[in-house]
Amino acid sequence: MLVKIELYHDGEFWCARGIGEDIFTQGATLDEAVENIKEAVAVHYDEAEQPTSILILSEIELGSRTTTAS
């Protein structure tokens, strides 16, 4: 089974929520959030239905890009 997680930065924390699942966690750093995702997924499912993979989807802002006309 594949679990899909949306990961985003809310300005202070990295937040993660399950897509189609009642899973939510967060972390102060990206690495902490990923570890918390693994733990949250593990406790969400019974032992018999543990997922085999976690797909983490994230949008990361690159900052403002300016273009100049030539």
What are these regions (language model features)?
Residues 21-31:
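A short, exposed loop/beta-hairpin motif centered on an aromatic-Gly-Thr core
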